[in-house]
Amino acid sequence: MPRPAKGARLGGSAAHEKLLLANLAKSLFEHGRITTTEAKARRLRPVAERLVTKAKKGDIHNRRLVLQTITDKSVVHTLFTEIAPRYENRPGGYTRITKIGNRRGDNAPMAVIELVEALTVAQQATGEAEAATKRAVKEDALKKDEAPAAESVEDAKPAEDAPAAEAADDKGKDA
């Protein structure tokens, strides 16, 4: 029978740790973000990421595997229908941990663990438009820098080209 990694358990036995992580994952998927201790957030992250990855696959086998961890069917339904499609094109990194200081009563280090919002199509389009604008500004700046140098060269060329153009016109008139 597999057991959790050696070392300190979160709150006691291995069974208690398993249930604690399942409840934390359930709350995370229900609310999108939860505040907990840093140790619990660090232990929750791989569990939650694994569940989202299974939900992205979307088949009945993976749904049953997720139901072994999270027993609330409504949360599992939300995970499979709303949360997993958001991360369709994201290979991992579905959660973010932000440290928020120490708890007032026992000075325990606290953190917020939240689901990272996937880029929407509108956000991607906005980002692409901003990048295109920046490129256009850079190109205009380069053209302006090159323009004074090019004008001085162009001013010299028409004077040299003018006699050749006149000679060509004369040849055309003679024919």
Swiss-Prot record:
Region Disordered: start-end pairs: 127-175
Database matches in SUPFAM superfamilies: Prokaryotic ribosomal protein L17 (SSF64263)
GO molecular function: structural constituent of ribosome
InterPro entries reported for this sequence: Ribosomal_bL17 (IPR000456), Ribosomal_bL17_CS (IPR047859), Ribosomal_bL17_sf (IPR036373)
Entry's Gene Ontology BP terms: translation
Keywords attached to this entry: Ribonucleoprotein, Ribosomal protein
GO CC, one annotated term: cytosolic large ribosomal subunit
Gene3D superfamilies assigned: Ribosomal protein L17
Basic and acidic residues composition bias: residue spans: 131-147
Subunit (UniProt): Part of the 50S ribosomal subunit. Contacts protein L32.
Family: Belongs to the bacterial ribosomal protein bL17 family.
NCBIfam families the record matches: L17 (TIGR00059)
Protein name stated in the entry: Large ribosomal subunit protein bL17
The encoding gene: rplQ
